[in-house]
Design a protein with these regions (language model features):
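Electropositive
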Residues: 10-39
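Gly/Thr-rich phosphate-binding beta-strand-loop-beta motif of the actin/hexokinase/Hsp70
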Residues: 1
């Protein structure tokens, strides 16, 4: 994951994804992470996952796609640190992007609500 200022890479981070890391998130519970253009829509300093910043998934297109399948698109996708009581499980991120706590401090401090985020493989 790259943190950019305009076209300049400020930092690079390794991250973890859910149990189905390939392909765009389609419906709630599919274990995938959204792909595409979104924005940061909230910040949570009291997250169960150290600190977290919310991604604006689902957008209108995501909702329409899931509705066409008769399902919910899911939601509450975040970039976050590790849980306060961390146990490595097969899908502890639930479709979110997880980074180390120290890295999450940097990201949290540098990213504002409204910041665009581009999620691509």
């Amino acid at each position: 994951m790259f943190l950019l200022n305009e076209q300049d890479v400020l930092k690079t981070y390794d991250f973890e994804l859910g149990f189905a890391p390939t392909g765009h998130k389609q419906v709630e519970g599919d274990g995938r992470t959204p792909e595409g253009a979104y924005y940061i829509d909230r910040k949570n300093p009291n997250s169960r996952f150290y600190l977290s910043i919310g991604i604006s998934y689902p957008n209108n297109r995501d909702r329409a796609r899931a509705a066409a399948m008769g399902q919910s698109p899911g939601g509450d996708i975040f970039i976050h640190g590790t849980p306060k009581r961390f146990r490595r499980e097969p899908d502890w991120t639930w479709g979110c992007l997880a980074v180390k706590d120290r890295e999450m401090e940097d990201i949290y401090a540098m990213v504002n609500i409204g910041t665009p985020i581009f999620l691509y493989p």
